[in-house]
Amino acid sequence: TEDTVRKNAEYMAAHLKDYGWEYIVVDIQWYQPTAASHDYEPFADLVMDGYGRLMPAENRFPSAAGGVGFKPLAEYVHSLGLKFGIHIMRGMPRMAAHRRLPILGCDATCAQAANPNSICAWNPDMYGLRCDLPAARAYYDSIFQLYASWGVDYVKVDDIAREYPHCAKEIEVISAACRACGRDMVLSLSPGPAPLEQAEHLKRYANMWRLTDDFWDSWPQLKAMFGRAEKWCIHAGPGHWPDLDMLPAGAIRQVQSPEEWTHFTQAELRTMMTLWCIMPAPLMFGGELTKLDAFTLNLITNR
């Protein structure tokens, strides 16, 4: 919710900004009024504008009222000296295609650009796009121009990083739209495992890409990260960073169990943080910042 985003941004500005933490990212389903858990609701009603572009659910993000989108929330985050990001799924809402909504900037409809055979296996909200058609580029241009108008600094595109070879062209079209939108944005691709043989393609078209599926507080998962980091570390450099996923530290699983803490021991947390830093991989914190304990705060600030 907007309240959660604002409180975490305020905490980051007060306690973490001086140590290099700078992005506040709104995760999945911000456009679904009924989203209430980590389970996806098949064929839920999603909030869109007249061009099939997803908009924040106003019951959860009240500053978006009146069709202004995330602009007020992004402005607040920027006022704290931080940057603002969002999560999206690749493609367009299936609702937009079924309603044959127009695509901004061209004569085609969403139905003409959609690929009904390209659907995420775990979230049925979207259709992939027919990226051989100009209408697909026009749609992606329209959403990135919208995000630029909101003041978005970071876009995480899901259901794409491991979907080679059939999503290679879609990655290229998304990248082109992002670069042409008139605002500098980090382009992050998920989920993994991204294929190692596509490293040069990923470095050319994205800033970050996930090496794994969702990473949780499990020692076997953490141990496996060493092998992935060893293979990918040579591809890390300015502008292109292999991503080991968020750090599952502190208070996580807040929807299911608000009092639950990470299952990692302090030794495992030190191991995780050390590996991410020596690779180096992007540091994205996955817990509730306002509940940080002294150990975790010291760990992620290296104090």
Where do the PLM segments sit?
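Glycan-recognition and catalytic regions of carbohydrate-active enzymes
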Residues: 284-303
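Glycan-recognition surfaces
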Residues: 113-118, 131-132, 138, 142, ...
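An acidic-aromatic substrate-binding cleft motif
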Residues: 1
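Aromatic-lined carbohydrate-binding/catalytic grooves of carbohydrate-active enzymes
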Residues: 4, 8, 12-164
